Amino acid sequence: MSSILRLDRLRQFIGELATLLDSRPDESTLLAQAHPLLAELVHQDDWLPEDCARPDPQRYQQYLLHVDSRQRFSVVSFVWGPGQITPVHDHRVWGLIGMLRGAEYSQPYAFDAGGRPHPSGARRRLEPGEVEALSPRIGDVHQVSNAFSDRTSISIHVYGANIGAVRRAVFSAEGEEKPFISGYSNSRLPNIWDLSKENPA
């Protein structure tokens, strides 16, 4: 990684995604056109502030990087400690996941006739630079884990809302639905807008 933090990459992504949303595309078009934007962002690992890349030994961390002023989307760095794994959960909004560092596994789930979740389809391994889409329309129930037992992995998640305000659910093996709203691990946003440090007079 470069010693110079390229916050301009994150600013560019935010601006391009906001412009795309301004055109009010349908979901299929949105996911198709936002995919390469996120792929470009995670192709370079020189822009994420260190404060938003710190793992916790007890639990995976979700650092808010940006929320659109109209809450049309949010950008989160998802930091995995070694061997950490989520419960089976849904999202209720569209999302894109881009792998920045390390790798993660995503196992899709479906529900049987009795309402119990079960693995559905192949588990996918997401490598740096790769992007995966999800939504209630194409499938948004999955379980995700760090692919490594001995190191940190980081993925960048983009959601079609302020995910810190969306009521969604985790599911037990018996299909019991437990509502939750995922919070953020940071209390302050990274300052990506002070260009004076990047362009000194």
Swiss-Prot record:
It catalyses: 3-sulfanylpropanoate + O2 = 3-sulfinopropanoate + H(+). It comes from the Bacteria. One of its GO terms (molecular function) is oxidoreductase activity, acting on single donors with incorporation of molecular oxygen, incorporation of two atoms of oxygen. The keyword Zinc does not apply. Does not contain a cysteine-tyrosine cross-link observed in all mammalian cysteine dioxygenase (CDO) structures. Thiol dioxygenase that catalyzes the dioxygenation of 3-mercaptopropionate (3-MPA) to 3-sulfinopropionate (3-SPA). To a lesser extent (40-fold lower efficiency), is also able to oxidize cysteine to cysteine sulfinate (CSA). Cannot use N-acetyl-L-cysteine, homocysteine, and cysteamine as substrates. The physiological role of this enzyme is unclear. This is 3-mercaptopropionate dioxygenase.
